[in-house]
Amino acid sequence: MPPSKGLNGKLEKPKHALQAIVLSDSYNYRFRPLTLDKPRCLLPLANTPLIEYTFEFLALAGVQEVYVFCCAHAGQIREYIEKSKWNLPSSPFSVNTIVSRESLSVGDALRELDSKQLITSDFILVSGDVVSNVPLNEVLKEHRKRREDDKNAIMTMVVREASPFHRTRARTESSVFVIDKKTSQCVHYQANERGKHYVSMDPEIFNEHEELEVRNDLIDCQIDICSNDVPALFTENFDYQDIRKDFVYGVLTSDLLGKKIHCHVAKENYAARVRSLQTYDAISKDVLSRWVYPFVPDSNLLNQTFSYQRHQIYKEEDVVLARSCIIKARTLIGAYTKVGDASVVANTIIGRNCTIGSNCSIDSAFLWEDVVIGDNCRIGKAILANSVKIGNNCSIEDGAIVAAGVVIGDNTIIEKNKRLTTFESHSQGTLNDPSLVGIGGRGQEYHAEEDSDDEGEFMEASGLIESTNELHLSDSESSETSSSSEEDMEFIPFSARRDSANTINSEDFDEGDFNKEAQQSLERAFEENHQIDIAALELNTLRMAMNANYHEVRSAIVLALLRRIMHLDVSPKEALAKVMTRWGPLLAKLTFSHEEQVDNVLTLQKYCVRLSMTRHFLQLLGYFYQLEIAEENAIQEWYSDPRSSEGELAALRDAGGKQFVDWLNTAESESESEEGSE
C-alpha cells in the first residue's frame, strides 16, 4: 500500500529534509493483554501516549519529515495522528503513514521502505516507544562528517551509558558492544544468549585496532542514524530480521560488505525504551522525577492542565480529593478524578475520570482512564487499563495486569502476576468465573502465547515486578527479532483489514528458511493463479532442495491459506469460500494418509487460535471435510487426541470442534436410521 499523503499537507519537502522512520509496531507479545485492542505506541505513559514522547524527541532533533510505519492497529494510529497537533500547520514536521499487512519484523519494514524509495538521504530510525531528550545535532554532524570521509560508514547507533543493572535497562538485555576507543567504530556486537558468559571475537580485530573497549554498560534504545544504504542492505539480505542480532552482527562479521557502524555513547541526558512492563514502570517514575525534562507532566504536551507540587506530585484541574485522603510523593492525578475519604495514594499514576472509593490503599499502581475502584480496596504494583471496575473489599496484588473492560466483583483477590482480559480468544478457563473475577465480574485469565522462548522466559521478559533471581540476564531482543506483532488483534471483518495488519509470530509458526521460501512460493501461486499441479510441484521441489518434510509443507499451506483469507477485501464468508474452494485441493493433494489428515486438523486448530480466527474454525473444518483434507474418521480421531485439548487449544476443541463432531454423529445416526427403514 502506498504511503498516505502527508497528514498536515506538507507536500513540498526540502531537498535534503532530515527524515525519520518511526516503527510503531514492536513485533513481540510483552505487553499483552493490554495491546490486544491498542498499539503499544498509544499506551499512556504518565497520561501521555508513548508516541508523543517519540515525536517530541524527533522535533528536538530538527526532523522535517516523519514516516510512521504501521502494522497492527494501523487505523488507530492514523486516526490519532490525524487528530493530533502534529497534523497542524504549526507542526515542525510532516507526518506520513505507511501501512504494511505483511510485516513480521523490523527487517520486513525496512525492505518495504526500500521498495518505496522514500528515503533521499540520511535518516533517523526509532521505535514508537522511545523516551529521550538526547540532542542529536552533534551526533548528526559527526555521522555526516564520517560519511564524507568514508562512504562505508553507514550507521551510527546512539546508546546511553548506564550500569548493567540500571532500572531502565530491560532485565533480559545484556548486549556487548566492542568499540574502537579512538574512532567510535563498533567492531563487534554480541547479543548474549541465556547462560552464555563469554564473548566470541575474531582475533583479527585486535590486529586492526590499537585500543578497544568491551562494554556491557550501554542501554540500547535502538536510536539509529542511518544512511540510505541501510534499507537497501536489508533488501539484499532477505534473512535479516532484527536490526541488531541480524543486521549489525551481519555487517560487522561480513568480509564482503566492507561497511562500518559507529556508536555514540550518551553520557548525560536521558534515553530509554519502553520495551517491557518493567521498563514501563521505571520510565514512568523517571518522568515524574523529571529526568526527562523538558518532557515532564507540567509541560502539558497535550491539552492538559498539570501543575507541579512538592514531592513530585502532579495534579490536573478539576480533581476532587476528600479532606481525609492522603496523596503521597511521586503521584500523578488526571482531571475529573475523585479520591474518597481516608484513602491513601502513593507512587501512583492515575488517569482522567477515575473514581476511587473510601479507605483504599493504592501504592505504585497505574490506573488508566475511567477506572472505578470501590471502598476498602488495596491496589499494589499493578496496571488497571481503561474502564476497569473493581468492587468493594478487593485486593489487586503486585504484578497483576487487568486489561480494558474487565470487571472485578466484591470481595475478590487478584493474585500476584495474574493477567486478565475480556478477549476470549486469548484467554483460558471459564468465562466470567466467579472464583477468578468474583460474583458479577467479567473477564478471563489471559494465556500467554509462547514464541521463541518458553512461557516462563516470556513472563520474565515482560513482567511488571522484578525478582532478584532474574538478574542473570539474557538476550535483550530475543523476542523482538521475529515475533508476532505484539499488537495482534482479534479477527475483525476483512474489509477493515486494508489499513491494518495482523502479524504472526514466526517462531510460533516454525518459520525457518523453508517456511519463508514456501510462503513466497504460495503467494506467487495465489497472485499468478497457478494450477494446483504446478503449485504442488514447486512446493515438492522446494521441499527436496531444503530437506524439509511433508508436515512442514502442509503447515506452510495452512498458514498461507489463512493469511490469504484474512487479506481479501471481501466478507468473511466470501473469503472463506473463495480461498478454500480454489486452493484447498492443494492441501488435499499433499496429504497421503489418515495420520496426516489428523495432523492437518491439529495444524488448522493451532493457527486459528494464534491468528484470532477461532470464530471461523467451524466453517474451515467444514471445508476440510468437504474437500477431503480430513475425512470423518480423521476429524473424530482429532477430537479424541489429547493434543487437541492442550492449553489454549481446548476452548476451540470444546466449542467449534464439538459442534462439528456432534453434527457428524447426528448425520451418521440419521443415515443409519434411513438405511434401517428401507
UniProtKB/Swiss-Prot annotation:
Residues with PTM Phosphoserine: S500, S506
Subcellular location: Cytoplasm, Cytosol
GO biological process: cytoplasmic translational initiation
The entry's keywords: Cytoplasm, Initiation factor, Phosphoprotein, Protein biosynthesis
Chain spans, region Disordered: 467-489
Residue intervals of the W2 domain: 508-674
CDD domains on file: eIF-2B_epsilon_N, LbH_eIF2B_epsilon, W2_eIF2B_epsilon
Alphabetical list of Pfam families matching this protein: LbH_EIF2B, NTP_transferase, W2
Main location: cytoplasm
GO cellular component: cytosol; eukaryotic translation initiation factor 2B complex
SMART domains on file: eIF5C (SM00515)
Signal peptide start-end: none
Disulphide linkage map: none
GO MF annotation: an example: translation initiation factor binding
Highest taxon of the lineage: Eukaryota
Record's subunit section: Component of the translation initiation factor 2B (eIF2B) complex which is a heterodecamer of two sets of five different subunits: alpha, beta, gamma, delta and epsilon. Subunits alpha, beta and delta comprise a regulatory subcomplex and subunits epsilon and gamma comprise a catalytic subcomplex. Within the complex, the hexameric regulatory complex resides at the center, with the two heterodimeric catalytic subcomplexes bound on opposite sides.
Functional description taken from the UniProt entry: Acts as a component of the translation initiation factor 2B (eIF2B) complex, which catalyzes the exchange of GDP for GTP on the eukaryotic initiation factor 2 (eIF2) complex gamma subunit. Its guanine nucleotide exchange factor activity is repressed when bound to eIF2 complex phosphorylated on the alpha subunit, thereby limiting the amount of methionyl-initiator methionine tRNA available to the ribosome and consequently global translation is repressed.
Family to which the UniProt record says this protein belongs: Belongs to the eIF-2B gamma/epsilon subunits family.
PANTHER family named among the record's database cross-references: TRANSLATION INITIATION FACTOR EIF-2B SUBUNIT EPSILON
Protein name: Translation initiation factor eIF2B subunit epsilon
Organism, scientific name: Schizosaccharomyces pombe (strain 972 / ATCC 24843)
